[in-house]
Amino acid sequence: MDIEQKIKDIVEAPNTTTLQRVDGLLELDRDVLDLGRGAPKEAMILSKKYSRKIYRAISKIDKQTGKLLLDHLDG
């Protein structure tokens, strides 16, 4: 299963609160970033790309948190 599908599954999960969905996306981001540590430069670039997708999904659920995460990713 690819990252986009995992993000979609978490965002569209039935019977979950906003907090549960944001937590699920942040856990996915943690897993993606763990793959990037000690990895070649290409893997680190890819993990940052995935983080951006995850944070954009978070911003659709919780605008304030998503904006904060995106701002810090770029900074």
Describe every region a protein language model picked out.
Residues 1-75:
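Alpha-helical propensity feature that highlights long, continuous alpha-helices across diverse contexts
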